């Protein structure tokens, strides 16, 4: 029974596609975002890197959870005139879209 908890027997953290910002479309179809769950170890590292600043921490967790679009891509950051995935999220999303991303990230980490 204990073997079910071994690393090699555990399922990978969840990844899911979801609707975050319907205004981003290609060929008339909404571009879905792909987000992933993060480990508690990664979460703790993000907390340290954030300087224990709650606002920065939140943005960093969201950015770390986004698989697609590639928030680290220089071309996407350049198109919004920002540097850094966290800054990109704050610039490219409306307040409601940002809230939708927060909800999706929370759900994928349950």
Sequence positions of predicted segments:
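Low-complexity intrinsically disordered segments
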Residues: 1-13
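A short linear-motif detector with a strong N-terminal bias
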Residues: 11-14, 44-46
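Short acidic-hydrophobic surface loop/beta-edge motif
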Residues: 14-28
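Short, intrinsically disordered low-complexity segments
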Residues: 10-13, 22, 35, 55
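Generic alpha-helical secondary structure signal
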Residues: 9-10, 17, 84, 102
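Short, surface-exposed, charged amphipathic helix/loop patches that serve as local interaction elements
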Residues: 26-110
